[in-house]
């Protein structure tokens, strides 16, 4: 006797919708996080494209001197940007209905806040969607954990830093030259290059690139040939096969002889954990560093650390960097301040 089990049809439209959202058979997994992710990222992307092309100038410093960022107002792909929300708005939530008109909303840089808040919500939901799909497939959760590093970095520059500085106008502009301007001003005001957490981030990014290149080249160079010399080595493998495609012992032996034995991994799991953890931890630290510098806990300051027996300063490289920082700072918001804060906060020396 044969028993036939039929899949029970969900009685309601809502039930069928739930089944569709959580199905792992879809070409692209939706998930409950995806229900929020899709509209928020579509909104952020659409507004970014429209504003990058056609947004009018924005009064970023709140001093009635609008700065143009869009293509139709004289910029190109390199110089164009979504200009941050005006300092006159500060940290206020500024949706379109809070402004007297759309023109006022555009003048005060409303699109920046709209894009950033939707984008951050969207990428957080993307991270949640990674966890959700892993959970439904019975996988471990580390893909979402790794993605938390760029999410933390984006949150630091687009949300935590403006909160610490008191205004969305201090957030990173959404453009190529705007990003570099943000970096230069950040160095001038916070000496980020002398912050240990930024140094860890640099080691994470560049080290991760090096390790990725080393791993990929070693694996590609130690493939197990399953074909003749007249055929491509790639023809000897099929997706999902049980057999290994490369010889980790050969790769370990090569690298162990190239440097020394214990510089090479002989365990695939520990190797791939290291490849994932190195850049992720580095970027976590950088995001943490930016978040602390947001509240003006800045990089190390070794200015005027060396003096002679008469108390005269002997300039070191730290003093050269400090002079460069001051130079960058006086060029930033040059019409908003008479002097940068570092120069205005001390009494002028007596000359004579």
From Swiss-Prot:
Site (Stabilizes free radical intermediate): 190
UniProt site (Cleavage): 344-345
Binding sites annotated in the UniProt record for chlorophyll a ChlzD1: 118
Site residues, Tyrosine radical intermediate: 161
Assigned GO CC terms: chloroplast thylakoid membrane; photosystem II
Maturation-removed propeptide residues: 345-352
Taxonomy, superkingdom: Eukaryota
Protein's UniProt name: Photosystem II protein D1
Gene this chain is encoded by: psbA
């Amino acid at each position: 006797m044969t028993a036939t089990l039929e899949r029970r049809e969900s009685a309601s439209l809502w039930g069928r919708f739930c089944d569709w959202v959580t199905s792992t058979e879809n070409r692209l997994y939706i998930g409950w996080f995806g229900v929020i992710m899709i509209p928020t990222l579509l909104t952020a992307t659409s507004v970014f494209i429209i504003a990058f092309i056609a947004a009018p100038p924005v009064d970023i410093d709140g001093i009635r001197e609008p700065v143009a960022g869009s293509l139709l107002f004289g910029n190109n792909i390199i110089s164009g940007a979504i200009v941050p929300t005006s300092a006159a708005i500060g940290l206020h939530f500024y949706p379109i209905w809070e402004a007297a008109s759309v023109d006022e909303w555009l003048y005060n840089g409303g699109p920046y806040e709209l894009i950033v808040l939707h984008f951050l919500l969207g990428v957080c939901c993307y991270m949640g969607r990674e966890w959700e799909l892993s959970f439904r497939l019975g996988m471990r959760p580390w893909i979402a954990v790794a993605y938390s590093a760029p999410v933390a970095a984006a949150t630091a520059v687009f949300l935590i830093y403006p909160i610490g500085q008191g205004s969305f106008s201090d957030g990173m502009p959404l453009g190529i030259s705007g990003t570099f301007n943000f970096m230069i001003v950040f160095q001038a005001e916070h000496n980020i290059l002398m912050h240990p957490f930024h140094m860890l981030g640099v080691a994470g990014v560049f080290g991760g690139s090096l390790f990725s290149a080393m791993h990929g080249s070693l694996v590609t160079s130690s493939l197990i040939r399953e074909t003749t010399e007249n055929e491509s080595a790639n023809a000897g493998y099929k997706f999902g096969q049980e057999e290994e495609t490369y010889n980790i012992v050969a790769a370990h032996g090569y690298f162990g002889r190239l440097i020394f034995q214990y510089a090479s991994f002989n365990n695939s799991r520990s190797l791939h954990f290291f490849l994932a953890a190195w850049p992720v931890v580095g970027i976590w630290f950088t995001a943490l560093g930016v978040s602390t510098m947001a509240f003006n806990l800045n990089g190390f300051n070794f200015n005027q650390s060396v003096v002679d027996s008469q108390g005269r300063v002997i300039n070191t490289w730290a003093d050269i960097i400090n002079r460069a920082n001051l130079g960058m700072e006086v060029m930033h918001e040059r019409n908003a301040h008479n002097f940068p804060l570092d120069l205005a906060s001390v009494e002028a020396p007596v000359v004579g």
